[in-house]
A protein has these predicted regions:
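Amphipathic alpha-helical dimer-interface segment in Rossmann-like NAD(P)H-dependent oxidoreductases
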Residues: 63, 103-121
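Flexible N-terminal pre-Rossmann segment of NAD(P)-dependent oxidoreductases
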Residues: 1-11
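Conserved catalytic-site loops of classical short-chain dehydrogenases/reductases
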Residues: 69-73, 98, 121
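N-terminal Rossmann NAD(P)H-binding glycine-rich loop of SDR-like oxidoreductase domains
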Residues: 13-25
Length: 121
């Protein structure tokens, strides 16, 4: 993090999980970090990876604090809708696979789409 300026502002998406919360704590402990935005499904504003309108609203809220210097996405899921990963081809469920893809692939892409414009140039 030596390349970040003094007084940098950071965003952690997925801040309620083990990795995300550890990142938030590390950033809050850095005296050079002026502000940490920690977003997740239960935060205010809430951020749900499959809700693009909500993500846009969260980005607008974060933008009010000024430009970001660091955006970290610590999201992802292995168990979707209570289903464990498949161990046999017969267990494949297209709907569960589509939901996992939306959360693990499209969601982070939407984070980039909405929060990249907030990065300091």
């Amino acid at each position: 993090m030596n390349s970040l300026p003094d007084g940098y502002r950071a965003l952690v998406v997925g801040s309620s999980g083990a990795i995300g919360s550890a990142l938030v704590r590390a950033l809050q402990a850095d005296p050079r970090c002026a502000q940490v935005h920690a977003l997740h499904r239960g935060s205010t504003p809430a951020l749900e990876l499959t809700d693009e309108a909500g993500m846009a609203a969260a980005a607008a809220h974060v933008a009010q604090s000024g430009p970001l210097h660091l955006v970290l996405c610590a999201t992802g899921t292995l168990h979707v809708d209570g289903r464990a990963p498949e161990k046999r081809l017969a267990e494949l469920d297209p709907a569960a696979m589509a939901r996992a893809f939306a959360i693990n692939t499209i969601g982070p892409a939407l984070v980039i789409k909405h929060f990249h414009p907030l990065l300091a140039r």
